[in-house]
UniProtKB/Swiss-Prot annotation:
Name this polypeptide is given: Small ribosomal subunit protein uS9
TM ranges: none
Superkingdom per UniProt: Bacteria
PANTHER family: RIBOSOMAL PROTEIN S9 (PTHR21569), SMALL RIBOSOMAL SUBUNIT PROTEIN US9M (PTHR21569:SF1)
Gene Ontology annotations for the cellular component aspect, listed alphabetically: cytosolic small ribosomal subunit
Keywords: Ribonucleoprotein, Ribosomal protein
Family: Belongs to the universal ribosomal protein uS9 family.
Molecular function via GO: RNA binding; structural constituent of ribosome
InterPro entries in UniProt: Ribosomal_Su5_D2-typ_SF, Ribosomal_uS9, Ribosomal_uS9_bac/plastid, Ribosomal_uS9_CS, Ribsml_uS5_D2-typ_fold_subgr
SUPFAM superfamilies documented for this protein: Ribosomal protein S5 domain 2-like
GO biological process: translation
HAMAP family recorded: Ribosomal_uS9_B
Biological source species: Aromatoleum aromaticum (strain DSM 19018 / LMG 30748 / EbN1) (Azoarcus sp. (strain EbN1))
Amino acid sequence: MAVSYNYGTGRRKTAVARVFIKPGSGNIVVNGKPVDEFFSRETGRMIVRQPLVLTENDSRFDIMVNVTGGGESGQAGAVRHGITRALIEYDAELKPVLRKAGFVTRDAREVERKKVGFRKARRRKQFSKR
């Protein structure tokens, strides 16, 4: 008999996470590494576990994640978004709780592009009067 996974795609900045959850003991594997090894900062690990802690499912699921693009912060946010979506697919009654905490909404903030004639996105060249 095949094990049934629940799937969720999470995105944040330029990072994309594909999250698969199945009933288990609470193991979280990101790109083949344990979550504590993959995310070197404690904040990244905390962000990833937030939806599970909120819904009190931190030791009920084994989670397998593939994440690409972005940096450490963006990837952590993408994984959180993916876990949230997978939990909702598993049990739709969790949606209002997760929505209230703000985990369901995709954080649409992206890096603003650099403009021609500027040093950065908004930083202009220094003005010289003479």
